[in-house]
């Protein structure tokens, strides 16, 4: 489980999906480790890097990343131990040192039949095992330009989150949300910074109606953006908690560039800047 972070913490992460073979994955993990080690400011924990390699890489990845600020993630999990051939339980992932697990990615929803009930079981099982769910959400098609389109998309994403926690907003407070518009995944360019910022702003307003713990608000839940994300995007976003990178970060140097952008944002933004409805450029608080 990822520990509660300081005010203003940013996430920068990447999944390799199934693009890299075993040897290439080892080389890539070593290169990412080099990029992180070259930035000692990451040790402060205000910018949190994470990597999500394919399942067979997890034991080796744990060794390569040992002693670094990098959080190891998994691309999927089952929802129970026992007779589930081919699945990997969250409890086993925890034993391997996995800190977060991707759940509900659009590709699994579309091609592998993952529905809301299955995703909810996985989210609960991961949380019970002490592994932070990285819940992937996003509208299937562009909802339209302007305020109305962004609000429609936010309402859809809010519903996905509610279904994933089965209405348990206390559980929701322990999630990291990856907002990935399905139409932006694998596209030539990410969704526009203006659109993403507007969707996240509306989503925070909707989540803010839920207060699972006295003194906390789900409007402060970490929401990172994914969907053809690449260097140069993060400084343009407002109210977004970081980036979930894909193919652009398979070049470890690009991962380093985004880490630099996050560290620069952290250096110029005051800790008390995170308030619902304000321009925050990635500021967030994980409710304790």
Residue ranges and their predicted role:
Residues 2-288:
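Active-site loop-to-helix "anion-binding N-cap" substructures in soluble metabolic enzymes
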